[in-house]
């Protein structure tokens, strides 16, 4: 598909805007996947807040220049799809789960905060719990001592009432 110069500039600008707000980029080769499969992935990515698109590598190379993701430029070879997201774990997790179900979708590389990752590193990132899971674990850990203290304080009057009830039952 041929683009005129204005369309090319618009695509590069759109990708640059997404990259400016991104915390992570995952690159995957999609050779041999059907349109239906890619559409399913696009829907899931959109629901997760991930910008997922098949873009010409030259457009993305121009968009990542002078960004923390510029190290990815050498990995941009072949037919690639790009997942750009604000949460590195969710971005890696959504694309990795799709790759597990579809052998023809292969994660090639990724980047976050100036660090370029291999496909294996992206898989390891996908294995981490999400931000919400980590926050709920932290909240549970912080809440446990307080809850235990409250139960202990509540036990003293309860024990007294049970003792009075036992005395009343004897009489």
Curated annotation (Swiss-Prot):
The UniProt record lists the keyword rRNA-binding: yes
Keywords for the protein's UniProt record, in alphabetical order: Ribonucleoprotein, Ribosomal protein, RNA-binding, rRNA-binding
InterPro entries: Ribosomal_uL10 (IPR001790), Ribosomal_uL10-like_sf (IPR043141), Ribosomal_uL10_bac (IPR022973), Ribosomal_uL10_bac_type (IPR047865)
Pfam families (UniProt xref): Ribosomal_L10 (PF00466)
Organism superkingdom: Bacteria
GO biological process, one term: translation
Keyword rRNA-binding: yes
Gene3D superfamilies: 3.30.70.1730, 6.10.250.290
UniProt similarity note: Belongs to the universal ribosomal protein uL10 family.
Function comment: Forms part of the ribosomal stalk, playing a central role in the interaction of the ribosome with GTP-bound translation factors.
Subunit details: Part of the ribosomal stalk of the 50S ribosomal subunit. The N-terminus interacts with L11 and the large rRNA to form the base of the stalk. The C-terminus forms an elongated spine to which L12 dimers bind in a sequential fashion forming a multimeric L10(L12)X complex.
NCBIfam families in the cross-refs: PRK00099.1-1 (NF000955)
Name used for this protein in its record: Large ribosomal subunit protein uL10
Organism expressing this protein natively: Nitrosomonas eutropha (strain DSM 101675 / C91 / Nm57)
